[in-house]
């Protein structure tokens, strides 16, 4: 589902997207939560993503390269786990690309919930993505498919990574 209530603003454009995805993983829910709570595991599942530095238990830095055709944008940024409840298996985090001239500013808030499921775990993820394009070159026709494709590929990689790793299988 996408939110389309953002208006174009001069100079440049503001885009706000609200995206959700659900996937099932053939692993124990507590194990899945612990793995997804690790920034290195999570960023490794983002195409073009990598962890560059762990600051402390809640803060980290990373890099994500996003491409569309021949164009690529590299984002260095910081992340912070803003909420975590291991008993409920819920967590939230915030990612922010560092300001770079001539590159759209991107901020992401993500929340996840891991529930028990007949196949092991169900992972529900919600993303709120804000893109500020100061150049005025981007339009929603480019932003929506790029964001959706990146998220779809991330969710597929989460499932593949977790199911391809030795871990607790459901009873």
Residue map of PLM features:
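Hydrophobic ligand-binding cavity/cleft-lining segments
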Residues: 1-59, 69
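Glycine-rich portal/gate segments that line the openings of hydrophobic small-molecule binding cavities
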Residues: 53-97
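A generic structural micro-feature
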Residues: 13-15, 54, 69-75, 85, ...
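A conserved amphipathic terminal alpha-helix motif
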Residues: 132-170
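Beta-strand/loop substructures that line and gate deep hydrophobic ligand-binding cavities in soluble
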Residues: 83, 97-148
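Hydrophobic pocket/interface hotspot
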Residues: 32-36, 42, 62, 81, ...
